[in-house]
């Protein structure tokens, strides 16, 4: 079983390489209307060095960088203005007063509004999700709770090319416990000359290190290659060998279907500014499975028993939050991991972005995404051979083993020239040293015609 089950790879007719065919896919797209819910940066604006209002020109850019930062939903301004008006008009009363004509709950309950919407995206119960902090900060909090090394079980299994912030976080927790990172951090990578890490290799690492490993922490989707890991299979197997299992879902959140509760994942964390469109540095989210979030009062109301974590007043139950008696009683579930009063301004941006997802489902978005990425792959490979191409797609070809992103490894010396040429053509995508262009058509706002146009520009840039 794969993360998304068995996915059939879309097949395309003989005329699929034409612009007319791309336009026909757009015309038949049931989600096409969602594009109107976003502000697409214009070609003129992305070339400007001064602040400009949206729509400086009528010609939008082609924005394939949602795997780095999503574009702004039109709802964001409305939600922010509502929050600012609440603050300016009633001040501190905004914590408890529900404004009838605002799309937002009172500040005291606003994080729960966001968590409820996020829970549908990650496949969890609302009380298993908390809207809080940022990704690395949340990983620190979760590691403090779940990484409990012993004299015999202290290793952490992780991705060989983890995003640097994840690596730093794990390394710091290892050092915090006075352990040697070189001996404690076990890096799982692909075989020499390849980029995909087979599931069986991960399982073999679990077998090899199970007696000494305390935890495995992997990315749901590897940020560099775009590989989607088999979350349920890896989680189940690691549990069978006695490991705690955590996932960094930075590139999986709002990109692929997730069922964190059903898959019995112990903990997970994600950012919301990529496919989630909540804005640069937006408030993040975390998941704690219900089995770890329970609060036991069997020994009395003043002696709650719960999983150890770093605590703060906002993780305290609302019934005691303002009593100021220094008797911590955590909110059951992920909410009990909250530390401080969250920014109502940040939550407004997050709730605005989530309001778009509330109008559809991850199943529908994933269905379109699989077709878009397959079409991109088809056009990139058409009329080429391994020998003639000046790039290699290092993302798995199996739709069940990838999300929206394709990572193109260019031949040496081409990256900066190609990236410059694409930007001149009004195309925004992500480059990663030493030679990868990451292309991510996002089903909420990108089109099949844009995919066709991108491929024409890329091939022209490679031929220069």
Swiss-Prot record:
Reactions the enzyme catalyzes: L-kynurenine + H2O = anthranilate + L-alanine + H(+); 3-hydroxy-L-kynurenine + H2O = 3-hydroxyanthranilate + L-alanine + H(+)
Sites of N6-(pyridoxal phosphate)lysine modification: 274
Location of the protein in the cell: Cytoplasm
GO cellular component: cytoplasm
Cofactor: pyridoxal 5'-phosphate
DNA damage in keyword set: no
Residues annotated to bind pyridoxal 5'-phosphate: 135-136, 163-166, 248, 251, 273, 313, 341
SUPFAM superfamilies: PLP-dependent transferases (SSF53383)
Pfam families according to UniProt: Aminotran_5, KYNU_C
Entry-linked PANTHER family: KYNURENINASE, KYNURENINASE 2
Task of the protein: Catalyzes the cleavage of L-kynurenine (L-Kyn) and L-3-hydroxykynurenine (L-3OHKyn) into anthranilic acid (AA) and 3-hydroxyanthranilic acid (3-OHAA), respectively.
Subunit organization: Homodimer.
Similarity comment text for this entry: Belongs to the kynureninase family.
Name listed for the protein in its UniProt record: Kynureninase 2
Gene: bna5-2
